[in-house]
Structures are given as structure tokens and as C-alpha cells.
Amino acid sequence: MLIHTKAIIISALKYGEADLIVKAYTLSDGLCTYMLKGVLKSRKGKFKASMFQSLTQLEIVANHRGGGKMEYLKEAKVTGNYQSLHTHPIKLAMVMFLAEMLRNAIREEESNEPLFHYLEYSFQFLDSTDKIANFHLLFLLNLTRYLGFQPEMGIKDLPVFNLLDGIFQDFSSNDYCIEGKNVDLLKSFLGTDFDALQYIKMNQTSRNDFLSMLLLYYELHIEGFRKPKSLSVLNEIFG
């Protein structure tokens, strides 16, 4: 079936001497994988390798067969050209980390329009802002809403957060209950917009600890989830 849709690049892997295998999250069909023949050698072809950098936003025309098969792109053009996302060194490190997180966390091969629009808006915001130190934390916390394990927000005044059940409670009931600074930060982040992130003050230690807590939360709720290899680079940059 010929599909016209928006897509966000998750990863691009070199295959052989000149081909790319590209994973993209599409508005029409969720996660899709494309084979791009000869893109790394052709100078006059309609596709350029730079179009498939992580988190690039595209409009594409593709043949979608479904069933987990490799799809084929017919046309692609970059939309919402980023001004700094792929050139600012700190943002580039964050792009690597977030793309790897998405690759490890998203399994859907079906349309999820709210998730697509969340990704689309988030990366446009990251491109436009210079207040980025805590962006990845709120991004990952909000992402849980679309993946089905958002923290329960009804009772936020309780002192303990149960990572296993995703709820606040007044006592520890298992080995995955946390309290203290990370719970206070979690309450601050919940309901916060990206443009208010600058008002959440964190130092190196608290930022790294909170991220470690989020990654554990992902591990508990996504079977087979792996921590990103780029995590150490991100921690070093924000250290």
C-alpha cells in the first residue's frame, strides 16, 4: 500500500557498503523499518544520508506491506528544519541518548497519533530552547503516558513512590519503593511543561540519581528494556 505520512527517524544502521537500514516512527503505522539502497554512495540520488540523522522529521511516501517486513521509501523530504539539534554538541549528545531510549522502548507497529505528536513537538522544542539540562528527564517521564505506565497522579502528597505499581503511597511495600529527594523531584516534574523546566533546580548528583530512577522505572515496565549505551556520555556532559 502506498502511504503518505510523517516520520521521525529513530536510527540508521549501515548495511553492506552503501545501504542503510532506517527505523522511523511514523504517524500512519507506528514503528517501521526501511531499506535504503545505495544511499551512502550515490551523490545524485533523491536521498541523502544526512536526511536520516536521529530524530530528523520527514514527510515520506513509502510502500508499506506491514507484518514486520522491511519497507521501501519512494520519496522523503525534511520538514521543520532543525536549527541546532544536530550541530549543538550538548544537544547532539542528548539526541543520541533519546533516540537510543526510543529504540529500546517503542515496540508499536501500529498508529499512535498522540505519541507521534508528542515526539514531534518535543524535538521541535528541544531544537528551539537553550534551557536543556533537565529536558531529557521530563521527556522520559512524559513518554510513560504514551507507553502505558505513567505514574498515578491522583494522590501526590504521600511520601513514598512505588516504582513497580506506579503509585504514591504512605509506606514502603516492596524493594522498588523510593522516598526522599527523588520523590520530591518526581512531584515537581509531574504536570510541568517544558518551558517551565528552568524553575526545577538540580545539581549533578540529583540529576544523575533521578535519571537512574527513571531508567529503573522503564526496566520494570518494559520487558527486555536495555539501558542506553550513550548514558555515560550524557552523564559526563551534564556532570
Curated annotation (Swiss-Prot):
Recorded family membership: Belongs to the RecO family.
UniProt-listed GO biological process terms: DNA recombination; double-strand break repair
Keyword DNA damage: yes
Keywords associated with the record: DNA damage, DNA recombination, DNA repair
NCBIfam families: reco
UniProt xrefs under SUPFAM superfamilies: ArfGap/RecO-like zinc finger, Nucleic acid-binding proteins
Entry function: Involved in DNA repair and RecF pathway recombination.
This protein's record includes keyword DNA damage: yes
Organism: Christiangramia forsetii (strain DSM 17595 / CGMCC 1.15422 / KT0803) (Gramella forsetii)
Protein name: DNA repair protein RecO
One Gene Ontology cellular component: bacterial nucleoid
